Amino acid sequence: MKTTRTTFFTRDKNFYKTFFRLMLVVALQNLVAYSVNMLDNIMLGSYSQDALSGAATVNQIFFIVNQLALSIGNALVAICSQYWGKQETEEIRKLTGAALALSILIAAVVVTACTCMPERLLGIFTTSPEIIAEGKAYLGLLKWTFLLFMISNLLIAMLRSVEVVKISFVISVVSLITNGCINYTLIFGHFGFPEMGIKGAAVGTLTARMLELLIIVVYVWKIDTKVRLFDVNLIRIIFAPENRKIWRAFLKVAFPIMCSGMIWAISVPMQTAILGHLSADAIAANSVSSTFFQYLKVIVIAISSASAVVIGKDIGEGDIERVKSDGRTLSVMDLLIGVVLASLLFVLRGPLLSMYKLTDTAAVLADHFIMIMSIVMVGMSYQMPVSVGVIQGGGDTKFSMYMNLISTWGIVMPLSFLAAFVWKLPVELVVAAVQSDQLFKGIPVFLRFRSYKWIHKLT
């Protein structure tokens, strides 16, 4: 690697232009995607409680699929962004082919399981026969979206690694409009169409996913052809014996990221179960406060995605001092953005809560929860972009896996269980315990970042 002398913080205007362009578009894409899920919940909630609960149960399965898809996509970005820095698009093509084959294999396994034992899978999350029946009807169609989503997400990740992001926002908007229109028509039976209930929601989601995949395939095939992904010999390249090293290189990066994602994904239902044993007022307050928190979290995730591309490209270009300078700049910006987001959440909590009809007790608890989450937002806005964006994007994929394993299952889950069921602490402290990892993760993340041992050349 080159060791060009640079300033402590980068002064390269192109760095800031690239970072904020990537961050803004990815944030808008994620915001629209999150709104799609909210729209489904609102419409199904207006139709029937069992339909809403059935869809929520199926979404627990999709949550696992989503984490696997994101993990594979993040692994692809970590390697391909370095190749993009070297302008070696043929290697990006080979890696994308390997990642695509892995995504299809995982999706096929999940779809097969959903086909062969839907009741058993849904029974993991609920014992209600009514909810399982609704969930089975929903899953019958929705399972096919798992395959479509994993392919689309993988192609979007590949484009992000070469700094192409606008198409992902366009796709999300088209998906939102398509899903919303079909849901309105088929869930309730408007405009002469049959009233299909939860099956109508499944049709809307499936149609939107099919349209997403069609748009991204046409875009990669005919419009943005720098990677030439869909050449006729793609299948041969994926399985060619001489390209086994590509598979090994990808799996070496992808496996720790997938493990890290699963460590976190499995903990989420358990955290939900702990909070679900609180009072009805506390559950309602947590639901409201979490909604606002999730909208701001979209920005933090976008910062992580943009950081991974910028750092990976820097490493691919081979200037180690620039990698350090850009990393320092990103880490400070992450903290400052976190303070801004936390301040917004804290200051606007009154007007936001006024939109909901809550009991007096629930309103007070929601106010307290948002204050807690404002503090959490500062920690999360630093540790997530630095650990996932800078460190993982810099090629160190094992650090986050070990950190999540220790923090989630060694500290947060036991602490949350003790706070809720043994010590019987006030609900505010239980919520603080559940979210506490977002704060103390900052210490190992800072120490790892300052060591610069995360700079790994993967190409």
Predicted features and spans:
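Short alpha-helical transmembrane segments in multi-pass integral membrane proteins
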Residues: 1-26, 80-147, 194-254, 311-377, ...
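N-terminal transmembrane alpha-helices
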Residues: 11-42, 46-47, 60-75, 79, ...
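Transmembrane helical elements of multi-pass membrane transporters/channels
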Residues: 21-40, 141, 152, 175, ...
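Transmembrane alpha-helix boundary and packing residues in multipass membrane permease domains
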Residues: 26, 30, 41-42, 78, ...
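Helix-terminus/linker motif at the lipid-water interface of multi-pass membrane proteins
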Residues: 31, 35-53, 122-129, 185-196, ...
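Alpha-helical transmembrane segments and their lipid-water interface positions
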Residues: 33, 37-40, 44, 66-73, ...
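Small-residue-rich hydrophobic transmembrane alpha-helices
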Residues: 52-112, 149-168, 272, 283-349, ...
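Short runs within selected transmembrane alpha-helices of multi-pass transporters and secretion channels
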Residues: 73, 142-161, 168-179, 201-217, ...
